[in-house]
């Protein structure tokens, strides 16, 4: 695995969460920089005191990110891509909140069409799609050592570095009922 470091300054006005975490991210040999950067983006969107990266692509049954409380109970379960219904149901059964961060329009549109009916029944689930051009622009910002300012307001995400700025307008395919996203 290749190791990346990300120094972040996060201002999430939607959630009232502010922090300056330093993340160490292991990139699996088969993982693209786009997916790596989307994991960082997911971390920023769901930032929390105990949020951490899962063991990676080769670890079945473990999310891309998760947050546990002091008792070990799972608060937040984050999946990337287009997980099957069984995986999402399992996540919902084990955690308080589930986020699916979908990307790759060619894959996401048919996936969502096929799972929408089943996944719409899961109250604690949020599904966000990141448009291809914005995911590609974010991937282009990947460096082994990164420094970003991330601002989230009105569900829009701005990622700024010394060399580039990306505005991400996530498309909410499904919002969790009775919770901010």
Which residues are covered by each model-predicted region?
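N-terminal intrinsically disordered, cationic/polar leader segments
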Residues: 2-3
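Long amphipathic N-terminal alpha/beta scaffold segment
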Residues: 52-70
């Amino acid at each position: 695995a290749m190791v990346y470091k990300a120094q972040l300054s996060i201002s999430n006005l939607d959630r009232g969460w502010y922090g300056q975490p330093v993340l160490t991210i292991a990139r699996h040999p088969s993982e693209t920089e786009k997916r790596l950067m989307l994991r960082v983006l997911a971390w920023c969107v769901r930032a929390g005191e105990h949020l951490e990266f899962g063991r990676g692509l080769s670890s079945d049954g473990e999310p891309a990110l998760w947050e546990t409380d002091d008792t070990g109970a799972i608060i937040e379960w984050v999946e990337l891509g287009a997980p099957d219904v069984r995986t999402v149901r399992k996540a919902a059964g084990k955690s308080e909140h589930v986020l699916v961060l979908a990307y790759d329009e060619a894959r996401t549109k048919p996936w969502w069409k096929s799972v929408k009916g089943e996944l719409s029944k899961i109250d604690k689930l949020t599904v966000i799609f990141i448009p291809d051009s914005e995911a590609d622009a974010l991937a282009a910002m990947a460096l082994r050592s990164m420094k970003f300012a991330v601002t989230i307001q009105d569900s829009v995400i701005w990622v700024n570095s010394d060399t580039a700025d990306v505005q991400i307008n996530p498309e909410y395919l499904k919002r969790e009922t009775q919770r901010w996203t």
